[in-house]
Amino acid sequence: QGEAQLLAEDGLQGQLRIGASDTICRYFLIDYLKRFHQDYPGVRIKVTNSTSMGCVELLENRQVDLIVSNLPNSRLTSHTKTYVVKNFRDIFVANPEFFPFEGKTLEIKKMMEYPLLTLSSKSTTSEYLHQFFASHRQNLIPEVELNSNDLLVDLARIGLGIACVPDYMLSSLHGQEASLIHVNLKQQLPARQLALVYHENLPLSQAAQKFFDYFSAKSTTTASF
């Protein structure tokens, strides 16, 4: 009984509750969830989808055991523990038929002359981009703000603008990104991280600990926020 987290004769039982954004689920987390399901078929996996900011709220409300979040994330508190599991960069992509910038490097001020496609203002990515542009004395006003990186790529592909998306996403599209080019920015965007996050006052369930173990051996840093 209890939380049904005992080791039964046929393996680990219980539930794994995890929160992550669309992009993180699809382009990073899915392979780990597949492996976990194969290793522990007796564990029920519940994935709750939200922005990285929204996932912090899920964690604070004890609706999930773990979240995978972009860093930096201004919503994280001193009660959360983070383990970095991946470094990545955000890149600008566009259709060269509409934006012939291949082999060129744009100044950030020049980039502002073109329609920019970004995630919505309620995301860590938007917060990060606005801070970056502000640090170069530019006020970022996107042409389009969406809740989906996949849709941003689709709009960039048909020439509606220059989209900002994480590099690991494009590396997973298996050739579909061939119609897009990387638009080089002279002032390079700082690297960001993906991190496993849990609440220090809430002990991890046995299932959550097993999932965490997939990453802890290769974790690049441990920090409190």
Residue ranges with predicted function:
Residues 79-116:
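Flexible hinge/capping segments at coil-to-helix
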Residues 28, 182-225:
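A late-sequence structural motif
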Residues 17-19, 90, 106-126, 219:
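Short loop->beta-strand "edge-of-pocket" segments that line small-molecule binding or catalytic clefts
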Residues 81-91, 176-190:
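Short beta-strand->loop
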